[in-house]
């Protein structure tokens, strides 16, 4: 998706990644102390999928060109050496050159943001204070606490992501950062419990996937609100479900998704990871194995920065074997109505993943395979109460009727 380009004179270069559309808002990606390595290039490609024109400049080029280090002890020592020799003034000059290159590129069709990790997190803060950018995000921004005299110069929205146990930005430093932005509605400082420095770096021992995903969504929120791009996620999801349940076209359904999507029906762990796997699932096990009389009744829809949470009633007659919901269970011809929740995540204007939840016990009760007299479970009543809140609550709590 991306490749190296020349940024300025004398060999200053950077890795540029473009969105599928070929153009979009600009995003300057500032690397950690390991250079423009595989993780940085993957991050650039990821944000390109989100719709950005991404440029990751080689900030160590004056010492050694196109540095790409791993996390081994020898490379960590080399990284520390680069940091000791780094000329912050000249690096910020190089960032200004990179911003100008990005701003004037014909692919960049909108405003500019800056995103940084580690060393790059601090540089993102300084860039927001000293340059003309429209949004900034910094991960693990060690050293920001020593530059808070510039906080007042930051006029754009900014978010900082800090691990709770990051010793480089410990309690007092974190409190100083928070105090510097008191009263700023466009500034967010997020702390991630139990996480250390580099929690979003998949190559570090302290990588925390859940925290990294949360931080990514928060970062997207900053950028999308400030610089775009904006997509009609509801319309994209409606088209996906139309192709899935209406047209029943597996190939067309896949065209609404990213190149390597995944779907997980949580109660039965059915779905697929990757294009070929998921295409096979849709074509052979989902679309032809969903009852013809299936109805999706919308209850509520919450639309976020990069995802939709859809609450619905899923209604059908169990007249075929439903591989994805009731694998191996012969048709009972019973009617089923269940509350179902779909959490759908997007990358740019494509679906990236789906997490689908429902109460499998309620399904089993309604088709006669589970006796509600023996377990604290309910059948179609769960669907009925979703539509009518006046129906009785707490019927499964035996002591509820005793008083109160």
Region locations from a protein language model:
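N-terminal cap/leader regions of alpha/beta-hydrolase-fold enzymes
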Residues: 1-253, 261-262, 267
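C-terminal and inter-domain tail/linker signature
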Residues: 164, 200, 204-404
